[in-house]
Regions:
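Catalytic core of pol beta-like nucleotidyltransferases
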Residues: 1-17, 26-31, 40-97
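Glycine-rich beta-strand-to-loop/alpha-helix junction loops that act as flexible
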Residues: 21-23
């Protein structure tokens, strides 16, 4: 489901990676743990695109909470912790289409 949303926004995500981080990525998740999803690139994702993706994630039919974070705008300590055990779930280069 989450990967499907990222595919819908592939052109907006060009040049960015989307990662799963937190307890789901590190293997410490409990049954109802949330999904921490981050986006990172050379530049922050344009705010309009960020919120369009967030709205689509919120519309997913799931009982799980999904936290959507622009890691470019996160505190350096959070960004580093997130990326230490992150799993890339979507990636596209600037020139991919």
């Amino acid at each position: 489901m989450i990967i499907g949303v990222m595919r819908q926004f592939a052109s907006q995500l060009r040049g960015h990676k989307v990662v799963l981080f937190g307890s789901r990525a590190s293997g410490r998740a409990r049954t109802l743990s949330d999904f921490d999803i981050g986006v990172i690139g050379e530049q922050p994702l344009p705010i309009r695109d960020f919120y369009a993706i967030e709205d689509s994630l919120e519309d997913l039919p799931t009982l799980y909470r999904i936290d959507w974070v622009d890691l470019n705008k996160a505190a350096p300590s959070l960004r580093q912790r997130a990326l230490d055990h992150a799993e890339v779930i979507h990636e596209s280069s600037v020139d991919s289409g």
